[in-house]
Amino acid sequence: MSEKYIVTWDMLQIHARKLASRLMPSEQWKGIIAVSRGGLVPGALLARELGIRHVDTVCISSYDHDNQRELKVLKRAEGDGEGFIVIDDLVDTGGTAVAIREMYPKAHFITIFAKPAGRPLVDDYVVDIPQNTWIEQPWDMGVVFVPPISGR
């Protein structure tokens, strides 16, 4: 990855609210399925904005086996996704998104960020990100003091 895109808590909340406004009226949704772990925080923000209390998770792990990347479903929400929003923070190459689509073919699948390779796999997203860009999410960063350049 050659570039970095830094996401602040404020930016994340603004993007989540933008997605929530597109999902109105909220009564059309039975609940939210957050993809662990990246979709947990966006899922909580959406649940708040839409007044949705039924929140579930799907937990997927990727691991290397004979130099191939495989996905393992650790936990899934029941059903085919009808009436549910499935949310993740990002769609990148589309590997996880393909698995989600297979598990929940009737769900409305959304992300905050989308890279070109995965973009066709989601129903909605907020921010376009170049494929070679690494996203630094606020939950992966700490706030630290940075001394002035002058040293004074």
From Swiss-Prot:
Positions contributing to 5-phospho-alpha-D-ribose 1-diphosphate binding: 37-38, 69, 88-96
Regions annotated as coiled coil: none
Pathway involvement of the protein, from the record: Purine metabolism; GMP biosynthesis via salvage pathway; GMP from guanine: step 1/1; Purine metabolism; XMP biosynthesis via salvage pathway; XMP from xanthine: step 1/1
Membrane topology: Peripheral membrane protein
Cofactor(s) listed: Mg(2+)
Reaction(s) catalysed by this chain's protein: GMP + diphosphate = guanine + 5-phospho-alpha-D-ribose 1-diphosphate; XMP + diphosphate = xanthine + 5-phospho-alpha-D-ribose 1-diphosphate; IMP + diphosphate = hypoxanthine + 5-phospho-alpha-D-ribose 1-diphosphate
EC number: 2.4.2.-, 2.4.2.22
Record carries keyword Magnesium: yes
Entry's localization field: Cell inner membrane
Any one GO molecular-function label of the UniProt entry: guanine phosphoribosyltransferase activity
Binding site for GMP: 69, 92-96, 134-135
Annotated Gene Ontology cellular component terms: cytosol; plasma membrane
Binding of xanthine, residues: 92, 135
Gene3D superfamilies: 3.40.50.2020
UniProt keyword Cell membrane, yes or no: yes
Chain residues that bind guanine: 92, 135
Database matches in Pfam families: Pribosyltran
Residues annotated as binding Mg(2+): 89
Role: Purine salvage pathway enzyme that catalyzes the transfer of the ribosyl-5-phosphate group from 5-phospho-alpha-D-ribose 1-diphosphate (PRPP) to the N9 position of the 6-oxopurines guanine and xanthine to form the corresponding ribonucleotides GMP (guanosine 5'-monophosphate) and XMP (xanthosine 5'-monophosphate), with the release of PPi. To a lesser extent, also acts on hypoxanthine.
Assembly mode: Homotetramer.
Annotated family: Belongs to the purine/pyrimidine phosphoribosyltransferase family. XGPT subfamily.
Protein name in UniProt: Xanthine-guanine phosphoribosyltransferase
Native species: Escherichia coli O1:K1 / APEC
